[in-house]
């Protein structure tokens, strides 16, 4: 069968592995098997990873930004010799995980995989997910140090099978290197580089593949897509929205226009007031604005959403204005249309549909109540 160029490029990782396996087969032990490419795992939104599936149930996960590759083998699969350098083998079941990336915890909870995690890079008080905090308080998950200062002795004593980091670890590459020297595989997940909320949630398929729970991952993801889809079919509301916090040094921290929060505001039917702020090349999703610039851009916004994650929640208008006196002149403050995110917002990474639905209700209802992520600032 003649392959198109696209099919060839998609199959290339499989071809490379197969050739490597064939080259080694002459001297390989009897339990060595070649990997035969079967199909590319379908992804609808995520761009930061790919998955190539092979006969027998093995899957090659590739992080597109870094090029790192992980070959996930079923528990009873034969060893594969002659793999290209840099391919890390993960044999199922993957257990005793050291989880540093907080945004991954919610995906594990939706996969009913909390028991796969033994160690956390966040202390119990830092979790805004009840199940994670309870597991730590009960001793089922232990604190093993943050990303830059892990407790290597504890990690080794726990027979850690995998460390899951986010890209913060790139600031301390020696930590990743040390974990790998100890024989601990490290996945630096890149969901934060996805600009679409649906792409971020689709990372549940990455973990579903790794844990052998692909079907559940697909079901959970599809449910979230179906919850958002009706809103995407509605006309825009014509209203504007700002998402921000005031920093301790009197700057306004806002999301860039290409960020996933800005996209969720658009999905809900509003126009994000700082949509013209673009990525300056530092890969950060936020930027700090002088208060005068924030005032000019957000003064007439119909809705203000205060991000509680860094500076804490605000409950009253007085608390908000105490952070920045200029806010008293804002239209949304004067009309009583200011909301504050719950502190679990960024940790509940599989519930982004709830934020879109919440904001749509804020935009279209007079006094919405029972919202998941938004609380009124009164």
Whereabouts are the PLM-identified features?
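Proline-aspartate-enriched helix->loop->beta-strand connector
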Residues: 152-168, 184, 294, 298-304
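Soluble non-cytosolic domains of exported or imported proteins
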Residues: 146-150, 166-173, 194-201, 215-218, ...
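Extracytoplasmic ligand-binding site segments that recognize negatively charged/polar headgroups
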Residues: 95, 103-105, 109, 120-131, ...
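Bacterial Sec-exported substrate-binding components of ABC uptake systems
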Residues: 22-105, 216-243, 367-378
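Flexible, glycine-rich surface segments
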Residues: 237-314
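Structured C-terminal subdomain patch of bacterial secreted/periplasmic proteins
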Residues: 194-219, 303-378
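A short, structured surface patch at a secondary-structure boundary
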Residues: 59-156, 162-168
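N-terminal export signals
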Residues: 7-25
């Amino acid at each position: 069968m003649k392959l198109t160029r696209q099919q060839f490029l998609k199959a290339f990782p499989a071809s490379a592995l197969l050739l490597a396996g064939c080259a080694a087969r002459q001297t390989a032990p009897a339990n060595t098997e070649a990997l035969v490419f079967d199909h590319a795992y379908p992804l609808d939104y995520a761009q930061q990873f790919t998955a190539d599936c092979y006969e027998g149930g093995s899957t090659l996960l590739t992080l597109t930004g870094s090029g790192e590759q992980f070959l996930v083998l079923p528990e009873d699969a034969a060893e594969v010799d002659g793999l290209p350098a840099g391919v890390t083998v993960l044999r199922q079941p993957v257990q005793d995980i050291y989880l540093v990336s907080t945004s991954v915890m919610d995906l594990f909870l939706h996969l009913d995989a909390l028991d796969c995690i033994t160690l956390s890079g966040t202390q119990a008080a830092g979790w805004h997910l009840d199940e994670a905090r309870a597991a730590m308080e009960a001793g089922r998950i232990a604190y093993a140090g943050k990303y830059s200062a892990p407790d290597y002795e504890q990690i080794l004593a726990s027979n850690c099978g995998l460390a899951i980091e986010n890209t913060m670890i790139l600031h301390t590459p020696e930590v990743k290197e040390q974990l790998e020297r100890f024989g601990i595989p490290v996945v630096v997940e890149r969901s934060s580089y996805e600009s679409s909320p649906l792409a971020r949630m689709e990372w549940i398929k990455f973990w579903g593949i790794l844990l052998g729970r692909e079907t559940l991952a697909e079901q959970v993801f599809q449910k979230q897509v179906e919850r958002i889809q009706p809103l995407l079919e509605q006309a825009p509301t014509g209203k504007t929205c700002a998402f921000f916090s005031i920093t301790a040094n009197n700057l306004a921290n806002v999301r860039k226009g290409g960020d996933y929060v800005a996209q969720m505001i658009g999905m809900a039917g509003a126009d994000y007031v700082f949509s013209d702020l673009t990525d300056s090349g530092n890969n950060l999703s936020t930027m700090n604005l002088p208060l005068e610039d924030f005032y000019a851009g957000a003064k007439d916004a119909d809705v203000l959403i205060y991000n509680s994650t860094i500076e804490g929640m605000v409950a009253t208008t007085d608390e908000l204005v105490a952070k920045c006196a200029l806010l008293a002149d804002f239209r949304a403050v004067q009309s009583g249309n200011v909301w504050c995110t719950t502190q679990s917002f960024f940790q509940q990474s599989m519930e982004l549909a709830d934020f879109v639905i919440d904001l749509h209700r804020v935009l279209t209802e007079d006094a919405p109540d029972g919202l998941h992520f938004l609380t009124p600032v009164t």
